Amino acid sequence: MDSLAGLVLCGVSLLLSATVDGAMDLILINSLPLVSDAETSLTCIASGWRPHEPITIGRDFEALMNQHQDPLEVTQDATREWAKKVVWKREKASKINGAYFCEGRVRGQAIRIRTMKMRQQASFLPATLTMTVDRGDNVNISFKKVLIKEEDAVIYKNGSFIHSVPRHEVPDILEVQVPHAQPQDAGVYSARYIGGNLFTSAFTRLIVRRCEAQKWGPECNRICTACMNNGICHEDTGECICPPGFMGRTCEKACEPHTFGRTCKERCSEPEGCKSFVFCLPDPYGCSCATGWKGLQCNEACQPGYYGPDCKLRCSCTNGEKCDRFQGCLCSPGRQGLQCEKEGVPRMTPKIEDLPDHIEVNSGKFNPICKASGWPRPANEEMTLVKPDGTVLRPKDFNHTGHLSVATFTINRILPPDSGVWVCSVNTVSGMVEKPFNISVKVLPKPLNAPKVIDTGHNFAVINISSEPYFGDGPIKSKKLLYKPVNHYEAWRHIQVTNEIVTLNYLEPRTEYELCVQLVRRGEGGEGHPGPVRRFTTASIGLPPPRGLSLLPKSQTTLNLTWQPIFPSSEDDFYVEVERRSVQMNSDQQNIKVPGNLTSVLLNNLHPREQYIVRARVNTKAQGEWSEDLIAWTLSDIVPPQPENIKIFNITDSSAVISWTILDGYSISAIIIRYKVQGKNEDQHIDVKIKNATITQYQLKGLEPQTVYQVDIFAENNIGSSNPTSSHELTTLSESQAPADLGGRKMLLIAILGSAGMTCLTVLLAFLIMLQLKRANVQRRMAQAFQNVREEPAVQFNSGTLALNRKAKNNPDPTIYPVLDWNDIKFQDVIGEGNFGQVLKARIKKDGLRMDAAIKRMKEYASKDDHRDFAGELEVLCKLGHHPNIINLLGACEHRGYLYLAIEYAPHGNLLDFLRKSRVLETDPAFAIANSTASTLSSQQLLHFAADVARGMDYLSQKQFIHRDLAARNILVGENYVAKIADFGLSRGQEVYVKKTMGRLPVRWMAIESLNYSVYTTNSDVWSYGVLLWEIVSLGGTPYCGMTCAELYEKLPQGYRLEKPLNCDDEVYDLMRQCWREKPYERPSFAQILVSLNRMLEERKTYVNTTLYEKFTYAGIDCSAEEAA
């Protein structure tokens, strides 16, 4: 717990450090704090270039509740642009007494400076207006008696009584002792006679640093910089707060007389300089006179030999150097130090060099440079850059060039909102200097329209690049036309263009290309984002390649190439040309001519264990187009080598994960994992056979706790099995202790159950009779409901095969699925339920291993269409195979005519509920406020969910499956918080699917073409993915909350889209908008979406802001609308 608190304090310290560095130079000047009949004022001054909200001056009711309530007349200071002022005329002297503050805000952080005013005719006067001490100091707060009265003296803290002195014991100096001061002792202390009031009270303010002397940090264990000239060490940052008249990292550098501020740029313009001005700075400094002045009114000059704020510093100059009451010892050339006690090169105030007043940059990466001179030369940690929002940047690179210190800063992504006044700041022992400069961030240009294809041939295309109009800033320096084949994983090619019409040459025949335009503006990083993509296909020059090509090993020296029958459109003679070449030996190449009426060819006389590349084309008098390359190995002539790199990890009390690697070229068809309890007979082992050789890890489940197992791994091919690997030991963890014996309670329970046994038995028998009657009634009603149906059953089962009776000309082959035995399923809890289906958690046994599973089944009232869709889900899962981002099939079971589908169990439920549970401001407001977060999920976790779904959908699209119901409710969150796509009941295996039946539709997730024409493609899945991404960013909000489905039908074709969530970065929302383009072919593919999300994850930028900010609200949830969809 202490470590956690330390981390939290450390985070707070870092935030405060950034705030102090980036804060405005805020100073409160209290003119004549002792009020008489003269005019008095408060002036609050801020640096003009600093980013801040308007500064304010007000009464400090936290310190004194019972002061005047009248609002202050705050006006703009006529002599300074960034200053506010309150002036009291002589006639309002009676309303002045009290505590006041000046406040400014930077990046939402408030900076408040406090001061007080009191009557000069008060009965007592404080020794000082403020007093700053370290934690643990012994403090005497003293008031000087001015008027003598026969009354008790009373002392208050923050308006509450704490102490009194009998009237005959009131001393000339009234003291309040605070031993071992702590932060809670800080506050405004006041003294008066008991018969007096606020207007006869004297005030002083005690400031207690959070740390002991010369310490700072969250745990007060770091040593402060040695602050000179009565500077104060800030307990949160370790930096020196310099008194008025001094500057620099250690406050050693004296300003010119009558100047003040962090960089000594402010000046007291009155004839007598800063006389009668009390300067108040942020805590823990408090208030003091400017250097050279002392007294409560700061109207007394320092005595000879003294200098500094309140004249508390003694010169003690060496070598007869002169003492100045404003600057201290004035050292002659060659001398330095507070007392001129050191020899050396005279110190020079830093100066910022070669920094232009205005810089124009392009959005993207930006590396500004600050150069500074001075002596000693500024160091790395002494140079900073302040953004317009107050963020302080440290140098990424630093070096010395001649007499200059050069600091290079890095902004990974600068955007137009970053335009404004930036400040280069240098703070050394020789002083501090800041120079503001203006940065104008330009938006990179992007064409609004896709290029137009004017003409195409088999190897060329004529393009109108349509570079105007464009979004963003000009002028345009150059233009690029980017293009590449659609189905090839290769980089974009580009050509520079000067005219609007350009010809692309040397293209591949009968190939689909995509192209777009990129505009470049002046300046570094001026390349804009590519514009909308246009696709086109070049013409053919010959017959297309054979369709359905397949290359499989036949023997150790033979490969079998097959294809679909060829039906050419012309009557010309044709043949199939097959080219075969070896990967290992470039010289081994053969071309074979196959008669056109054949659909296969055996490639003979090959070498065992060798990889070959094969392609084919259909030739007539002209040569046809080559097919894509097919690659296959011949079968091995030797047993495979042992699996390598065996690793066992993620060991629990009942499971462990084993991984391995295998060598290519040995025709490995299966991996066998053999394990047994150490010490048992060889015939008591368990074999797990993994027939997919591409799988390289497996989780053993159903192990006994705290048991040593012996594990061997074999590889198997057409020749036989490899030798086993050297045995590996696996020791499972111990199981958690069983609950303690209930003892007497258990016996009492048995007694109660025994005495009530007959009653329970009677109730049970009655219940069973009623259940049987109800079941008979249900069966009768079901028979009546379908008595007129003469069709065959929707689903037919037969020993591990599934046949769907569809109304089609050609019934497909039955689907083969992994069979589970009914007795190997142990049902546990219901975890989900709908109108016609139910999902239960179960413990199943598969391949001898026990594991958790989710079992899906249909209810008795489900229709034939529901049963057909459910069986279709099994068919889809069988065809899809295994992928980490889809819910994978474990097996299926037919029992009494019903299908039970076993899939992976996702312990964290569906993504929609998971997102809504993360809304911690609704579920645990105290935690949300304490941690300043609106969600238990980070930006990275949310983007990982989005990337997982995109990866799974890319796999589905490659398998040419359409999901049709992609939404957060149909995404499950598995182990290690991996998102997995589920609910394939509506999936189809065609490239384009037209829905012809009515039913409940997920309208809020459907693409325009699906709503209007009931057409579903992978592109319509992309639209749904964009809505799902919106659900993730909005933490489970309802899409189009507050709108009816009828309104959606009307507004979507008019260009209306989901609004950008407040916590969403522009780049993520732009990705959503791309998914919602009206023309399906203009939407990105899932592979492109995944590339964009992976780049965002690598940049580790906060693309989804889950920080709790002021007036934060979650996106709306309308469950009734979701059900209606």
From Swiss-Prot:
Tell me the active site: 965 (proton acceptor)
As its record notes, the protein acts as a catalyst of: L-tyrosyl-[protein] + ATP = O-phospho-L-tyrosyl-[protein] + ADP + H(+)
Q: Which GO terms describe its cellular component?
A: cytoplasm; cytoskeleton; extracellular region; focal adhesion; plasma membrane; receptor complex
Indicate the transmembrane segments per the record. 749-769
InterPro entries recorded? EGF-like_dom, FN3_dom, FN3_sf, Ig-like_dom, Ig-like_dom_sf, Ig-like_fold, Kinase-like_dom_sf, LE_dom
Domain called Protein kinase: residue spans: 825-1097
User: What EC number(s) does this enzyme carry?
Assistant: 2.7.10.1
Copy the domain comment: The soluble extracellular domain is functionally active in angiopoietin binding and can modulate the activity of the membrane-bound form by competing for angiopoietins.
Query: Its family?
Result: Belongs to the protein kinase superfamily. Tyr protein kinase family. Tie subfamily.
| Name this protein carries in UniProt | Angiopoietin-1 receptor
Q: Which gene encodes it?
A: TEK
